[in-house]
Amino acid sequence: MEKLWLKSYEQGVNSEIDISQYSSISDVFRQSVEKFADKPAFQNMGKTLTYAEVGKLATDFASYLQNVLKLPRGERVAIMMPNVLQYPIALFGILQAGLVAVNTNPLYTPRELEHQLKDSGATTIVVLENFANTLELVLPRTQIKHVIVASVGEMFGMIKGALMNFVIRKVKKMVPEYRIPNTVTFQTALKQGAANSFKPVELTRDDTALLQYTGGTTGLAKGAVLSHGNICANMLQAKEWIKNSLHEGKETVIAALPLYHIFALTVNLMIFANTGSKIILITNPRDMKGFVGELKKEPISVFIGVNTLFNAMVNRPDFAEVDFSRLKLTLGGGMATQRAVAEKWKKITGTPIVEAYGLTEASPGVCCNPLNIEAYSGGIGLPVPSTEVELRDADGKEVPIGQPGELWVRGPQVMKGYWNRPEETAKAIDARGFLETGDIAVMDEKGWLKLVDRKKDLIVVSGFNVYPNEIEEVVAVNDKVLEVACIGVPNEKTGEALKVFVVKKDSSLTKEELIEFCRSELTAYKVPKDIEFRDELPKSNVGKILRRELREQAQNK
């Protein structure tokens, strides 16, 4: 496919990146530590660590893994923590020691955790004590030999830390009881590591850095094998994209999305650590009052989120009290941002939501809107530098400009494959190195892409293709709607019919009122046949609404 999108690039943005700049993620972070040593790196609950401090602690942790646990190169180490100061220390330490990090959602059920630990073959895990009880339930059935337990208070000094841990454990009772023999505290690991001499491990771009498990929105989670080169490439692609708008050592970034998710890991951790930014870690973004309170403490310049987070924010009166005078960039990804939400965000903050698109298998960034847009575009923008895309029909042939087709991607950010799944890898990546995304998109004559929907979410009503994103976009415009999801359900007359799940913003909303609203905005076959009101909708760890779960629930009724 001709690279039409290059003509639409922002002035000064190069079409290719130089991947040879870095040999590994450890190389990236080492250079940041040297260049921005005394600058604040990570802040959490009022405690700040400089780049030099994080670098020292990460090396201490790497030394513990290397000298005390004696883990061989390539061994898998799981991380089961939310956004706390120990997360970047553990991640950079694991990678520095030549090991492979396995990001694990701390909110996993025992079944989900067991699958991931067994599938990855992890032998060591770093877990925040709040979630150790889940680990205890599955531990005997995994290959885990070493358990390192972190606590929220341990990074805050002896007196303050002890007080914090007492409140968390005894007053708020946020640490369920667990019994795991022979655990080591994170602080002990750091001390024992510091007492030994770390021997640097030479890494290459082809070495595996992460086993990043797909979000489970498409079934059983698979481990995407992401190399140091994959992550470094995506970081450089993004850095090239943002260079006209953001400046080294001067940005303050909110990290509300979990760092164990690839979107936050690459964007929040890699890109902004590489540019010497101050990264404010939000441990529990569901505590919206506390989150907004954190935003009020100091002006931020970058906000990264997903539609559900933006939606929750703009519907809080206290969000308008935040100082947005320094906000330069709001980056949206993970799911489609709805226009109604984007318009409210722009009205309150003064900055548009810049929509990006990616997937775990691409580290994750594939496309992004230019940062100089004036308003939300409704599309996913342009392929980032050194990235090729093709839109194909069901027979694998390229579709004409303006016609919907499945998006395929090729670039240095595309994964090596799925962990221990050669057949799945062969299905996902073709002989030319293009990755199948499973997403339907349309490209215009200037190379701009608009995502239509997931191929698997397509609903066929009386032979007509209906994309649930379009229906959700329309329903979300209604002022009485807070959240919405659309699925297809079996129907004798039409094959499938549309069912919409809605969380009300205004309790007076009725089904009849909403159907009438849809009739005024949609052609007849796109009007939902059934509306179900819910108190909440099922979501993934980053807030993506899980249509698959809603389909399963509808089938079981």
Where are these regions (language model features)?
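A short helix-loop-beta submotif of the ANL/AMP-binding
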Residues: 75-76, 82-102, 106-110, 118-124, ...
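Conserved adenylate-forming
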Residues: 68-71, 193-206, 211-255, 277
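Conserved AMP-binding/adenylate-forming core of the ANL superfamily
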Residues: 20-21, 38-72, 78-84, 88-92, ...
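Gly/Ser/Thr-rich phosphate-binding loop
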Residues: 277, 297-304, 314-375, 388
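AMP-binding/adenylate-forming catalytic core of the ANL superfamily
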Residues: 125-129, 411, 416-417, 424-427, ...
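Conserved AMP-binding/adenylation subdomain of ANL enzymes
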Residues: 232-252, 262-301, 316
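ANL superfamily adenylate-forming
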Residues: 7, 138-205
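Conserved ATP/PPi-binding loop(s) of AMP-dependent carboxylate-activating enzymes
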Residues: 382-386, 397-428, 466
